[in-house]
Amino acid sequence: MSEVTLKIEGLRKTYLAGTPGEVAVLRGVDLTLHAGEVVALVAPSGAGKSTLLQIAGLLDVADAGRVEIAGQDMAGARDRKRTRVRRQDVGFVYQFHHLLPEFSALENIVLPQLANGISQRDAEARGAELLALVGLETRAAHRPAALSGGEQQRVAFCRALANRPRLLLADEPTGNLDPATSDQVFEVLMQLVSETGLSALIATHNLELAARMDRVLHLEDGVLVER
């Protein structure tokens, strides 16, 4: 059995607890993700997909349950440890790329590496390597506004993988793209996962894309159901 990259047990999250507007979005979520595995997370808007990804990626905390990333138990972990694990072991991709508009494609990939203590030279080499993997080596000097939507999202993938994470969390990464571009970007994502051997949990409304992943998990009434 391959290494466990992400393990979640008994995750619970309620918003506005104790008020008339109380909403329990996660009601005991369990999930195990192995190295190299790509898993789809499917649910309607407002069902808790983003909340689950944020807790899994240490951007939010659950009311109950535990999260383990690459063998590191995050239960009760201090902010400093959570930040270190998030920077080193987790990569994020969102529906909207959130690239910094004043920086080039390459610079957008270099910056998170510098924040993680990587030298400028090594960060630029890693950025160039990733851009070449997604076919954008000739677009390295272009700012986001000069790139197409699909190109911007490919740069966002590269940025997410810049620090060589073990886990990629993607929230509707193709949701803002037309069908043809969405398919192309998804293929690039699968190529990157294959090249790096990381694990990926990908939230999507696109059932056709979901069916091409290793497993499909549906978030229903706050729990995960595999189909």
Swiss-Prot record:
Disulfide bonds: none
UniProt-listed Pfam families: ABC_tran (PF00005)
GO biological process: lipoprotein localization to outer membrane; protein localization to outer membrane
Natural source organism: Ruegeria sp. (strain TM1040)
Domain ABC transporter: 6-227
Protein purpose: Part of the ABC transporter complex LolCDE involved in the translocation of mature outer membrane-directed lipoproteins, from the inner membrane to the periplasmic chaperone, LolA. Responsible for the formation of the LolA-lipoprotein complex in an ATP-dependent manner.
Record keywords: ATP-binding, Cell inner membrane, Cell membrane, Membrane, Nucleotide-binding, Translocase, Transport
Lipid bilayer topology: Peripheral membrane protein
Quaternary structure, from the entry: The complex is composed of two ATP-binding proteins (LolD) and two transmembrane proteins (LolC and LolE).
Protein name per UniProt: Lipoprotein-releasing system ATP-binding protein LolD
EC number: 7.6.2.-
The organism's place on the tree of life at top rank: Bacteria
PANTHER family for this protein: IMPORT ATP-BINDING PROTEIN, LIPOPROTEIN-RELEASING SYSTEM ATP-BINDING PROTEIN LOLD
The family this protein is said to belong to: Belongs to the ABC transporter superfamily. Lipoprotein translocase (TC 3.A.1.125) family.
One Gene Ontology molecular-function label: ATP binding
Record: residues binding ATP: 43-50
Phylogenetic lineage: Bacteria, Pseudomonadati, Pseudomonadota, Alphaproteobacteria, Rhodobacterales
InterPro entries in UniProt: AAA+_ATPase (IPR003593), ABC_transporter-like_ATP-bd (IPR003439), ABC_transporter-like_CS (IPR017871), ABC_transpr_LolD-like (IPR015854), MacB-like_ATP-bd (IPR017911), P-loop_NTPase (IPR027417)
